[in-house]
């Protein structure tokens, strides 16, 4: 990777380039309240479920735990999108690929955990027995190790992002052209994973998981553990992203977003900065996918659909780009609405999503968070 160069006096030599200020979006009280709210969701909810009977109105149902856990995974993806789009100005329509890669890596481990409890009583996953395979493919070599799985969840999305990003950024592909090729990448990967011979379960993908770390995966305690782990991961990534965007590295990213050519004239190397944040955002999505799969119980090539990547961008736009909190809020708003509309009025969901994106683009260019800021400034 090309490491960002950091000449000591380059910015002083070109006074026309001014890095964005470090003024925070929210006051210290606002940040504290947001972080406390996340901690409360992660800590109070499981405690209430332990102490309160299921008949209590404050007891979270299994459905609610799974839904909130899933939305928190989506919120991590939205936060990753904010780093690459909101703060660096690079619109990716392929982040669903990195989410799915992380999910598939975790899914491979969970399939190996089934062991002899599968329908065919074989050490091979059921779909391999059905296809009359005799041995595991080479890319399943480390899938029975949890430690190796954790490493691959980070390394595989990061490596794919690095290779793709290096050639794309080196070729100076920008704007809508970059968005198009990222969408083409995830579409090509989806078609590849649909093929049975690739060893990823074909169109059915992976499902029917039974254990994780040799513990039953469907018990209420395990579901709550995964829920808490997801919330803590979201909180950790949020704090990391906040530190990153307020650092000198983050201010250079914002300068690249606003005036990349002038940043180059100042002696900085945009390639290294863009590639670094691109890989970081891809790894975040991979981790989100790995947390998502054991909670929903399935992963298939449909997760790589270009529509899913577009939705990630919509979450960031609805909440408000370059705000950190905004994309998280947007993920909760959009997916909360989706969980209701797809049940009550399933035929209207795509129309609603399209109208929501158009409305935000025309009337709320800074998203919900921007509207709140404007309202507060007017008081």
Report each predicted region and the residues it spans.
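Transmembrane alpha-helices and adjacent helix-loop boundaries
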Residues: 2-379
